[in-house]
Amino acid sequence: MERLDALLRGEAPSHILPFLWMKGEDNETIREELVKIEECGIREICLESRPHPDFCGPGWWENLDFILPEARKRGMRVWILDDDKFPTGHANGGFIRNPEKKKVYLAERHMDICGPCRSGAVLVENFLQPDGKLLGILAVPKPDGQTLAVSGDGIMDLTDRYENGFVYFDLPPGPYRLFVLYTTQTGGGREDYMNLLDSDSVRVLIDEVHEKHYARYPEYFGNIIAGFFSDEPELGNVNGYPFDNTLGQKDRKLPWSGQLEAALREKWGDDFLADLPALWYESGEKTPGIRVTYMDEMTGLVRTCFSGQLGSWCEAHGVEYIGHIIEDDNAHTRMACSIGHYFREMEGQHMAGIDVVHHQIVPGFTEPVHQWIAGDRDGEFFHFGLAKLGSSAAHIQANK
């Protein structure tokens, strides 16, 4: 009854916060936009920062110096989209200035060798990317030449046999695959972007965007400034929008960080290097367990390093953290353009966000295949799964 009485008094709570596209317009134009929004009964907006030519520069601050008092006068709250480029993670160019903190990938190159071989040598230096850092070299038995599978047993660690660009070895009879495992910051997806698996990398975004806003407008935090919005942050280990990027795919770089390496070394112990090829290739009975462990540790770092860190910063400064990821066709459980685990990414956010765009939910198209703007996609997921992700997170996560 209290809600009904409030509605009858015209005291409806805010349930919508449209983007106010910031393109560097003059303040009078912005005032006109705010008036129109207010006339629609809307009391919250999200500043769409990315079209602005001077985000976190003098032009941006001039606009916010005008918007925030106007919002206060009109009883409106303001959210801020947290970056200068799509998707969230560019940190307003922060990784151009701090390249050592940008995204890192785990990569492999290999060649096949047939034993027996004594005093063998292979030039492997050129297997690495120009910036590649060698992680290890393995000789892995191949069970046959019919598939890409390798053996999970009998693996030889040749890392300490690497010298001056060559690896030297003796091999017993049989076919072997020589794996060169390395890390690199090039050749993957969005390279000048933050590493969601690295706390220091995510801190660059906070320093470049969040802290700068707080330093200028502390008196508006928690009242007029409601919080920050992240748009489709991604692991970004490969280019584009493959919704099916999982482990077990050849020639794919994988998300990586020093924190992830430390976690996997603790889990796998002496088998750390020997277990890595299973991330790309079938390696016997141990393959599923290795892949589950990698995904578990990796997405756990998404939670703690990325969403948890941003959410904690916002809470400490009296505001909230909201946004969404790419969920299309179950991509929320995968890598590339998404983050591997919807619920872990959402844990740091204060609302359970989803993205419904491009005619994804169309009445009647409830089966696994229907045509939408991106091709033949999963109508069953869009119809019955997508919204349920958000409602489930809202029920099970206490900060929602």
Which residues make up each language-model segment?
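Mature extracytoplasmic enzyme cores
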Residues: 1-10, 15, 29-40, 44, ...
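Active-site mouth loops of central-metabolism enzymes
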Residues: 16-28
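Conserved short loop/turn motifs at secondary-structure junctions
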Residues: 23, 48-61, 295-300, 327-332
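Catalytic-core region of carbohydrate-active enzymes that cleave or remodel glycosidic bonds
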Residues: 35, 309-315, 319-322, 338-361, ...
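Active-site clefts of carbohydrate-active enzymes
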Residues: 49-51, 186-189, 393-400
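Substrate-binding cleft/loops of secretory-pathway carbohydrate-active enzymes
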Residues: 87-100, 233-256, 315, 319-363
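Conserved, well-ordered alpha-helix/loop/beta-strand core segments that scaffold catalytic motifs
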Residues: 211-220, 297-325
